[in-house]
Amino acid sequence: MKKHRWSMDRNTDRDPQKQLNQKTMNDVTQNSQDGLLVTHVNQTQDLLRLQRSETQTSALEDSEDWLAMHSLKFEKLTLADLISQGTVELEDQNNAVPKVHFTTQTIYHFTSRLSDTIELYQQRMRWLTENSKKAFGLIKGSRVGLLIDSSQVSSGPQTEEFQNDLTSLIDEQLSLKEKLYVLTFGGTTNFLWPDPVEVSASTLQELKLWVKTLQPEGSSNLLQALKKVLARKELNSLVAILRSCPDQPSEFLSDFIQQSTLGRSLFIHIVTYKCDDHVPSAILKNLTDALGGHYHCYSPESELYTSRDVDELLAETHKAQGLFSQLQALCHNNPCEELSCMIEEISTEIAKGPFTSLLPKPPKHEAPLTIKFPDLDKTSAEWLKINGLKAKKLGLYQVLAPNAFNPVEEFVPILQKTVGATIHEKAMVQFEWHDGTVKNIHVDPPVLFEYQKQLGKAVQIYEKRLQWLSLTSRRFWGTVCQRRVVILLDVSVTNSMFIIHIQHSLRLLLEEQLSNKDYFNIIAFGSTVESWRPEMVAVSHDNLQRAWRWALGLQCQGSRNVLGALRKAIEVDFKDKTKHESQGIYLFTGGVPDQDVHILSAYVAEACGGCDLQLNVCLFYVGEPQMNTTPPACYASRTDTAAAYKEVTQAACGRFHWFGETGIYESDDSNAIVSEIEKALNYSQKCAFLVASLKNHSGKELLTAALQKDKPRTLQQSQPKKLYPPKPTAPSVARMV
């Protein structure tokens, strides 16, 4: 049988760089009559360089429409296009359902074109994820205003790396623009030129030298920088490179930009460069979405990489993979063995290379683990037993108890009735107790003020705990506390675009939280279940490294057989679960399971009952599936998915952890700390209420005393004087006349 080679090296003339060289050579030939007489090889090289620069400039300007001009739909490589090339036949006159038949040549030609298109996507992906485009994205526009955040620029290797990346951006992208306007901002703004300048060799050199002198300065006053750059009406592109969260709220910045750009065609491009905190990424992404611009996040240390161009290209490549699966199904019904082998060979190559090799990876993603030995972490519930308000004797009722008195009522024989004790309102306030009763509290303001200070210190400790829970591997997994641990990894086909994220999350866990455990195992599941080892093995440096190398070879396929993975873990790895303590299963998944939630809940409730075994769910949200992609086997909204897994964790007495690209959405560990903070704030408010009530009573007493003192004088002054009748007098001489 003759075997065709359909490798990804076919049709190399579609390489953008080779196309560019070929086009340039053709242009040289065509332009040789336009006064460009080449007499030396150096002149040819200069001319090629000039032509290449002009072509690259055009490519940068038209890149927004690149995918539209090379999409599967535009290239007529969709399933509908394939069906339109087939012939409809009725095999049985009694059967009204027609069947579509394809010739070998039709499928052969369609598959060849699809393979070429995927190769082109590969080349485009490499181009988008190299050099300055990886760090800052693809800068659009010809007259660019560049804002550089200098608030977090610090000395050391980080500064040098940032300056080198900026220099690369200047050489590769900004050098192809027409005009530039550059300023830095921190507490104040500093501009290189008072007005936009024409791009030339001298201005670019001046800019590169200026970048080397960047110094840290205060906070991140983005609004002040925007006011200056948006006043330059000649600019058609605004690029902001930030390394920290802006001082102003995103809603305020969005309103200001929209009002300032009303009636203008201005492209907004916001970059977060190595922002270690997830909060700036969330704020700036929402800001860019509201403005209809492009957001680019580059933070390899935190495993954050977001690019709209890359995401759209990956989605189109994913559709091509789905189409190949459909072609494979066609070949099973095709009698041509040669064609079936050809399709199988191409699909195998695609499954191996185009996706995981093109996905952006953190630095040293495939390097050996750097294993740390941490302390044995506790869940927040256990941690609060030692550091909570009650454990620290900072409960409000604990503090007030020595000065709290029950109301006293006794029968007075001489009065022949029951009389209640009088409250001394100058020092006591009636206060509702935690059991609903009312007690008389002796209020001592200095004691309560000191108590509020202690509450403030406790809240600071809780806030540090919250921040600690949101960093490194705990952001993805929470705290892994048990001594015997099994990790379940969701590698269903819907997670194909996120396999690097899944692997990186596992890497952080292996490095930071598993080295102090006793036994562990890793189970990957899609439609089928595959485990790293048949059963749990002892934790060692070598075993952790071997587990990581195994995880690097994982491929996403099939649906989401959660029940199968749970059964493998519980019935094989934890078959002796009643003989051991401190055992945990950590399910790392991105969507709703294949099985009904009630079935899962009933199974884990029975399996985890009567032993020290917990199921903890780590749910990562990857967004809603695209309407034009292959639908998942089971679908539920993000809220329904979260509710389903919360029900499962509650049945297994475990913890629920839900996160996404913008941070942690919900976590039982974090919720426990937040609840303790809210309790401390509530206690502080009640202290303030007690002091205010005491002051209010004292103020009323003083006012009453003053009124009583002034009352007689006021009444005396207000009474009208009594008028007496005039005394009788004798008639005057005038009246007698």
From Swiss-Prot:
Signal sequence bounds: none
UniProt gene name: Vwa3a
Start-end of Basic and acidic residues biased regions: 1-17
Pfam families hit by this protein: VWA_3 (PF13768)
InterPro entries xrefs: VWF_A, vWFA_dom_sf
PANTHER family assigned to the protein according to its UniProt record, in alphabetical order: VON WILLEBRAND FACTOR A DOMAIN-CONTAINING PROTEIN 3A
Protein name in the entry: von Willebrand factor A domain-containing protein 3A
Region (Disordered): 1-22, 711-737
UniProt source species: Rattus norvegicus
Stretches assigned to the VWFA domain: 484-681
Coiled-coil region list: none
